[in-house]
């Protein structure tokens, strides 16, 4: 259900350039998106799991905040992340 260590390091190197760049906004958005995808699959199997649904909504809110920050700081990086992750905005 959660991201494996290999998946997480692949996402970090793809969006951050190096494994140490975990604080970049692009990396954070990509990691949130991976976790959101996993939770969405879990909730399709278990529709009555209200606690996981709350966690999903919290992750979506966190991702939205980081995306808003990125849009205000650097619109080009924001557009690139949106295009790479196929997010609606």
Swiss-Prot record:
One of the GO BP terms on file: translation
Domain of life according to the entry: Bacteria
Entry keywords, A to Z: Ribonucleoprotein, Ribosomal protein, RNA-binding, rRNA-binding
PROSITE patterns: RIBOSOMAL_S15
Purpose: One of the primary rRNA binding proteins, it binds directly to 16S rRNA where it helps nucleate assembly of the platform of the 30S subunit by binding and bridging several RNA helices of the 16S rRNA. Forms an intersubunit bridge (bridge B4) with the 23S rRNA of the 50S subunit in the ribosome.
Complexes and interactors: Part of the 30S ribosomal subunit. Forms a bridge to the 50S subunit in the 70S ribosome, contacting the 23S rRNA.
Designated name of the protein: Small ribosomal subunit protein uS15
Protein's organism: Chlorobium limicola (strain DSM 245 / NBRC 103803 / 6330)
């Amino acid at each position: 259900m959660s991201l494996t260590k290999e998946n997480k390091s692949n996402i970090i190197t793809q969006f951050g350039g190096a494994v140490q760049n975990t604080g970049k906004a692009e990396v954070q958005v990509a990691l949130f998106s991976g976790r959101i995808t996993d939770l969405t699959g879990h909730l399709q199997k278990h529709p009555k799991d209200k606690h996981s649904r709350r966690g999903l909504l919290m992750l979506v809110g966190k991702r939205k905040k980081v995306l808003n920050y990125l849009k205000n700081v650097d619109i080009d990086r924001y557009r690139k992340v949106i295009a790479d992750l196929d997010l609606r905005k």
